[in-house]
């Protein structure tokens, strides 16, 4: 009986600690999307959205989302990338 009481106490303590770990605010340590290489220019009609990479990334970049839900990395300094971003912002 004493063993089962101890086991129950350990189980409850473990559950309490796990609950606190999993209740951390979303985004506290979430991974960031970074670009390690850039894609060539892709047709504008395939692009539906974009977001900029985090400032924590080693290379700045833009990630375009395609109609097929793929992510394409692009160099934010390139002219075509800036044109696509402007077009997406105007048509949002």
UniProtKB/Swiss-Prot annotation:
Q: What is the protein name for this chain?
A: C-C motif chemokine 3
What organism does the UniProt record list as the source? Mus musculus (Mouse)
Task: Report the principal subcellular site.
Answer: secreted
Cystine residue pairs: 34-57, 35-73
Summarize subunit and interaction data from the UniProt record for this chain: Self-associates. Also heterodimer of MIP-1-alpha(4-69) and MIP-1-beta(3-69). Interacts with CCR1.
What does this gene product do? Answer: Monokine with inflammatory and chemokinetic properties. Binds to CCR1, CCR4 and CCR5. One of the major HIV-suppressive factors produced by CD8+ T-cells. Recombinant MIP-1-alpha induces a dose-dependent inhibition of different strains of HIV-1, HIV-2, and simian immunodeficiency virus (SIV).
Q: Name one GO biological process term.
A: positive regulation of inflammatory response
Keyword Disulfide bond in annotation: yes
Ranked from the top, the taxonomy reads: Eukaryota, Metazoa, Chordata, Craniata, Vertebrata
The encoding gene is Ccl3
PANTHER family assigned to the protein according to its UniProt record, in alphabetical order = C-C MOTIF CHEMOKINE 3, SMALL INDUCIBLE CYTOKINE A
Q: Which UniProt keywords apply?
A: Chemotaxis, Cytokine, Disulfide bond, Inflammatory response, Secreted, Signal
